[in-house]
Amino acid sequence: MGKEIQLKPKANVSSYVHFLLNYRNKFKEQQPNTYVGFKEFSRKCSEKWRSISKHEKAKYEALAKLDKARYQEEMMNYVGKRKKRRKRDPQEPRRPPSSFLLFCQDHYAQLKRENPNWSVVQVAKATGKMWSTATDLEKHPYEQRVALLRAKYFEELELYRKQCNARKKYRMSARNRCRGKRVRQS
């Protein structure tokens, strides 16, 4: 009466893989007691694949198209596992941006004004090139800003963690009071 476990559909395979499977079965029928190593067998298959006519290849390509259609149909009906995302505490301080991100923030508007028809991706590529060609002297102000922001972040994080610990202690002491136990004050 529980939920049915739905397995992910088997991926579609190419025309060459269909040929390979067919060729392997024929080879086993013709020479059942012969062992051929993977490398040698792969070489034989690729030679045979190159030598067959387009008419024969069309048969395998049709199989591959059918397999692809089957896979796409199954994927439309497939409902995979939902990944649970960790809920972020809104009170938790956000990490500071990197020196590169600060550089991008400063230069984005300028590049957009100069090139209004550029997409966000094109502007990002341009700022990336500007950053990689910038000298250490040009990068230094951004690195200083990052150092200040990082110091501020760690102070806020320390304060946040103290507040979280205080809330946890309060919750624990409230539970203990409900149970009739004494709580040690520290």
Swiss-Prot record:
DNA-binding region, residue range(s): 9-79, 93-161
Keywords of the record: Chromosome, DNA-binding, Nucleus, Repeat
GO terms of molecular function: DNA binding, bending
InterPro entries documented for this protein: HMG_box_dom, HMG_box_dom_sf, HMGB
Entry's Gene Ontology BP terms: regulation of transcription by RNA polymerase II
Region (Disordered): 77-98
Statement: the UniProt record of this protein carries the keyword Repeat: yes
Family, as annotated: Belongs to the HMGB family.
Listed name of the protein: High mobility group protein B4
Species of origin: Homo sapiens
Upper lineage: Eukaryota, Metazoa, Chordata, Craniata, Vertebrata
Name of the coding gene: HMGB4
